[in-house]
Amino acid sequence: MKRHEMVVAKHSALCSRFAQDLWLEQNIKDSFQKVTLSRYGKYGHKNLQLRKGCKSVDECKGHQGGFNGLNQCLKITTSKIFQCNKYVKVMHKFSNSNRHKIRHTENKHFRCKECDKSLCMLSRLTQHKKIHTRENFYKCEECGKTFNWSTNLSKPKKIHTGEKPYKCEVCGKAFHQSSILTKHKIIRTGEKPYKCAHCGKAFKQSSHLTRHKIIHTEEKPYKCEQCGKVFKQSPTLTKHQIIYTGEEPYKCEECGKAFNLS
């Protein structure tokens, strides 16, 4: 996750999509002084959205005088024009770290009507809905596999080409994804950076922590389509489903007898 130096602009202006995407109404007011812009490239005044008829920030009375209450701001948000208080700082070079941190927040207000899954960002919910509609999927020309994110499409392409640009400086082992290299380094160091806030247990991978957190809740998101039984973890559901498939994956090395449970 790249961290960029933040440079504060003299004038105040903020794109609406950031606030609309990440915060609900009650959180926007408290967040004004802390926000960083969403991923829109390198921002300058010429890139910001202004009122009709305004050619620059200096000509826009809204930017000079700030906004007249929170409600006015929220109304403008819907039209993709957001006027902020003149004391709100705008970043020219901003970090993606705030956006990344929001993914790990417990506040997941945006719920999918199809599968009841909750997400922390509106853009994530919009993208998630495509899973159900199969809309605008990105297809790999080599293997035909489809993805709902264009960034995920680059991963199988590197597998097909054999390209491994990410190299471990310690052992020299190379990987086709930077995330796999990161996991590899953590295994080498024994570091467990992902800690459970409930019990303090630490994990090497964020996915392991996410799976662990379900233990502390009553949530059982994994349901068997055969009998309707629900489980907290997908591996438990997978083991349960073997009962219906007749599969016996666990084999005794001594006599060769196979079993459906370990």
UniProtKB/Swiss-Prot annotation:
> GO molecular-function annotation terms?
DNA-binding transcription factor activity, RNA polymerase II-specific; RNA polymerase II cis-regulatory region sequence-specific DNA binding; zinc ion binding
Alphabetized InterPro entries for the sequence: Znf_C2H2_sf, Znf_C2H2_type
Gene Ontology BP annotations: regulation of DNA-templated transcription
Q: Where does the record place it?
A: Nucleus
Show the GO cellular component annotation of the record: nucleus
Q: Does the keyword rRNA-binding apply?
A: no
Organism domain of life: Eukaryota
List UniProt keywords, sorted A-Z: DNA-binding, Metal-binding, Nucleus, Repeat, Repressor, Transcription, Transcription regulation, Zinc, Zinc-finger
Is NADP given among the entry's keywords?
no
Zn finger (C2H2-type) ranges are: 110-132, 138-160, 166-188, 194-216, 222-244, 250-262
Q: According to its UniProt entry, what is the function of this protein?
A: May be involved in transcriptional regulation as a repressor.
Which family is it part of? Answer: Belongs to the krueppel C2H2-type zinc-finger protein family.
Q: What is this protein called?
A: Zinc finger protein 138
Originating species:
Homo sapiens
Which gene is annotated as encoding this protein in its UniProt record?
ZNF138
